[in-house]
């Protein structure tokens, strides 16, 4: 839906210049003084909203001036602006028609935390994963020329995203094609000293100004008319210009790829940015603009701890501390349990190493990295490389554990298949954020891993019912000597007692948690405990369910399944994964392979659609995989019939 179809809600500001801004054409009338005040208003609105909703704060605070400069100089939405990842796009949303609904950021039915084409014509390309902007922008530029239209295409990409192979593939292609394309590299890891910044700014303004470009073009045309000597002088002048610039700015790589390099530019000086972008707008061919920004700019807590404020839960704007939580003790998160367990396993096995793709803290590997720095590898945003790197380690007897978010592992499917499983290498995949992730929405849900992993030969796929079982599954994965994946959800554990040491489970064996005679509920992973709760509710209605914790999606516990199908004619499967190709599909395939008929199977999971943003609880309720949904599905299957069988809960 376009934003105009949404109902306005309370504004984020009580006044100020932001209250007068709806669309980019409004900011094009402002002078530098007013733009500076607007930047302050925008930062206040972002901090106020994210403190309540959570979100990606530091990146968005760091790109406020850059956002204003881009929209002031370029004729958006006619000119296309593509944001990479989208973490930095909150200011963009505030000045492109979404100011009055910004308070709904990342909420159910509200605006997305990422650019979304369905939301606004200013959002040119849907994003959420990194490093896609350059390839997308090059495609848009090609389409523009095929249609013989005239508009500028601008991709804005962070320095972290530049570590991915996809970004370099896009650079290589677009530099070779020589289409009109502007890539803005938002570099928030470097700082510029005043002298270098001033000299670089002056040199770049001269080299990119319209007058300089016209003189350069006229001289080149004249020299080309002089046989032999003209071409030599032209080549010498080009090299001299590049050599002078290379002494001052780090743009040689981009120049070699076919781009005109501009920068580095100070990313928080609006006059400086606007002047240079105006020059860039009038240039032809591929241009890379290098802009230096500071993550968390304007909010002291985010400037001091940009990593903690990258993606943050609700917090107090006054103190920067997390919002007050319940005084009751909170179970450890699955991420924490993984981090603690992998350290224990590494102490026992000197061959074990850990790999992450720019998510050391997010995946819980901080303690491992500190205790075993020589056995810890952060490869940057390079998921494909991380998997094949792990495969290479495994061929030499090293035991790699790749810790990665479920949705990001999708980017390395071929590497899992071709480089790990085809060789049957013992690589362990620890898949954090499997299932619903909540407010980050469809780009970040981990709802496909059971389906795409169980389709690969040699792969073992596990999902724990709680945090204690997670540590045992990690031990199992490390010890099994095969490619193995353990997927676990975002958030806190169930609150069960933790065993002091992890141990291996029997490979491919599930467990019966609760026995009854009415029907069988086969659950895997996080839905196991809701299934148990539903069984308790149903007992009061005279429906007695057997609840099975499958543990393994691959291999299945064939012995247990044969016992189930001999005892029940009704089976309900529950998973936090898409139904297509998932755990329920594996059960149906088992029945077909064993020529078993007359069994009614109902599958609960995610329909053939992309799940939208909401809280995890809201999402589970929507798809019927919470205790109420499971109980309702059982009642439907039983037609509210009553069983005379008694239940024995273990």
Swiss-Prot record:
Its EC number is 2.2.1.7. Mg(2+) binds at residues 159, 188. It holds the Pfam family Transketolase_C. Binds 1 Mg(2+) ion per subunit. Binds 1 thiamine pyrophosphate per subunit. GO terms for cellular component: cytosol. Its cofactor is Mg(2+); thiamine diphosphate. PROSITE patterns: TRANSKETOLASE_1 (PS00801), TRANSKETOLASE_2 (PS00802). One of its GO terms (molecular function) is magnesium ion binding. Homodimer. This is 1-deoxy-D-xylulose-5-phosphate synthase. It comes from Syntrophus aciditrophicus (strain SB).
């Amino acid at each position: 839906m376009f934003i105009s179809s949404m109902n306005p809600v309370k504004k984020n500001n009580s006044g100020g210049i932001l209250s007068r801004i709806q669309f980019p054409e409004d900011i094009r009338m402002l002078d530098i003084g007013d733009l500076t005040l607007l930047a302050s208003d925008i930062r206040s609105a972002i901090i106020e909203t994210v403190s309540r909703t959570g979100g990606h704060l530091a990146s968005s605070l760091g790109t406020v001036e850059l956002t204003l400069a881009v929209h002031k100089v370029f004729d958006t939405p006619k000119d296309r602006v593509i944001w990479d990842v989208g973490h930095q796009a909150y200011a963009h949303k505030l000045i492109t028609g979404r100011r009055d609904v910004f308070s709904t950021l990342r909420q159910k039915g509200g605006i997305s935390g990422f650019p979304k084409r369905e939301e606004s014509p200013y959002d040119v390309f849907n994003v959420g994963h990194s490093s896609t902007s350059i390839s997308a922008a090059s495609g848009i530029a090609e389409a523009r020329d095929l249609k013989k239209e005239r508009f500028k295409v601008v991709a804005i990409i962070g320095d972290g995203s530049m570590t991915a192979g996809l970004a370099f593939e896009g650079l290589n292609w677009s530099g070779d094609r020589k289409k009109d394309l502007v890539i803005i590299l938002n570099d928030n890891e470097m700082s510029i000293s005043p002298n270098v910044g001033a000299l670089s700014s002056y040199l770049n303004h001269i080299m990119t100004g319209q007058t300089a470009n016209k003189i350069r073009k006229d001289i080149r045309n004249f020299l080309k008319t002089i046989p032999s000597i003209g071409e030599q002088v032209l080549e010498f002048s080009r090299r001299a210009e590049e050599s002078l610039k290379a002494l001052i700015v780090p743009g040689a790589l981009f120049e070699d790829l076919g781009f005109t390099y501009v920068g580095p530019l100070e990313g928080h000086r609006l006059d400086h940015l606007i002047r240079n972008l105006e020059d860039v707008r009038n240039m032809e061919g591929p241009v890379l603009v290098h802009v230096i920004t500071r993550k968390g700019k304007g909010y002291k807590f985010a400037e001091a701890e940009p990593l903690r404020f990258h993606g943050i839960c609700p917090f107090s704007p006054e103190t920067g501390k997390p919002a007050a939580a319940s005084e009751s003790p909170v179970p450890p998160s699955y991420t924490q349990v993984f981090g603690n367990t992998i350290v224990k396993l590494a102490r026992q096995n000197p061959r074990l190493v850990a790999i992450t793709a720019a998510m050391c803290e997010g995946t819980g590997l901080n303690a491992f990295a500190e205790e075993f720095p020589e056995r810890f590898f952060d490869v940057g945003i390079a998921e494909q490389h991380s998997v094949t790197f792990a495969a290479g380690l495994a061929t030499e007897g090293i035991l790699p554990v790749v810790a990665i978010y479920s949705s990001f592992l999708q980017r390395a499917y071929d590497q899992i298949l071709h480089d790990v499983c085809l060789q049957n290498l013992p690589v362990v995949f620890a898949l954090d954020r499997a299932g619903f992730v909540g407010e980050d929405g469809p780009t970040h849900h981990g709802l496909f891993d059971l389906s795409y992993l169980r389709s690969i030969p040699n792969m073992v796929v596990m999902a724990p019912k709680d945090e204690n079982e997670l540590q045992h599954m990690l031990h199992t994965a490390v010890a099994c000597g095969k490619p193995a994946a353990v997927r676990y959800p975002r958030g806190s554990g169930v609150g069960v007692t933790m065993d002091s040491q992890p141990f291996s489970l029997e490979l491919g064996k599930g467990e019966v948690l609760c026995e009854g005679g009415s029907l069988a509920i086969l659950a895997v992973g996080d839905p196991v405990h809701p299934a148990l709760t539903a069984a308790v509710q149903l007992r009061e209605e005279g429906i007695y369910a057997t609840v099975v914790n499958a543990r393994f999606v691959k291999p299945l516990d064939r012995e247990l399944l044969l016992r189930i199908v001999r005892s029940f004619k009704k089976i309900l499967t529950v998973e936090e994964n898409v139904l297509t190709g998932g755990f329920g599909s594996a059960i149906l395939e088992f029945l077909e392979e064993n020529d078993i008929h007359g069994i009614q199977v109902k599958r609960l999971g995610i329909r053939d659609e992309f799940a939208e943003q909401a809280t995890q609880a809201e999402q589970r309720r929507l798809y019927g995989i919470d205790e109420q949904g499971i109980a309702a599905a059982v009642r439907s299957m039983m037609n509210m019939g009553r069983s005379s069988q008694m239940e024995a809960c273990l």
